[in-house]
A protein has these predicted regions:
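TRAFAC-class small GTPase G-domain
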Residues: 1-148
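Cationic, amphipathic, low-complexity alpha-helical segments enriched
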Residues: 145-156, 162
Length: 162
């Protein structure tokens, strides 16, 4: 588990985000541990290996686990992003792709979650990964702000109707 601090300058307002990163390496034994962290977070990025059908299959299991733990995840503004990894193996090393981009997009569409695209953690194109994470964090932040404003609006309307 690593903690990373990221700042995003959005229209001159700097927002600080603390990110906790878990690399479970597809190990099912970590599922029980991470459930506790779902409750205290605002979003999660699920990453699979595009050269492994098995890795992609675990995404559905993680989604089920998130939905069981956070039954109201959509209403609460909880964001989920799916990201394909190991693009370098397909592009540079001639390894066969086991999961198409379309399959990644389809699982996102089916579950109403955000598709982050595909990348390579090995070649770590810093700008690409930074951009993916920043986009995700902006979506988390905007969704939380919109829900908060909606909540305040409802309170004010109820107050005025009394």
């Amino acid at each position: 588990m690593d903690q990373v601090k990221i700042e995003i300058n959005e229209e001159t307002h700097i927002k600080n985000f603390n990110i906790t990163l878990f690399d479970t390496a597809g190990q099912e034994r970590y599922r029980a541990i991470t459930k506790n962290y779902f409750k205290d977070s605002h979003g999660i990025i699920l990453i699979y290996d595009i050269t492994s059908k098995s890795s992609f299959g675990h995404i559905e299991k993680w989604l089920e686990s998130i939905k069981e733990t956070l039954s109201d995840w959509k209403k609460s503004g909880y964001m989920i992003m799916i990201l394909g990894n190991k693009l370098d193996l397909v592009e540079n090393n001639g390894k066969k792709r086991a999961v198409t981009s379309e399959e990644g997009k389809n699982i996102c569409s089916k579950n109403d979650i955000y598709w982050g695209g595909e990348c390579s953690a090995k070649t770590f194109e810093v700008n690409q990964i930074k951009e993916i994470i920043e986009t995700f964090l902006k979506k988390v932040y905007i969704k939380k702000v919109l829900i908060y404003k909606l909540y305040l609006n409802i309170i004010m309307q109820n107050k005025n109707n009394v």
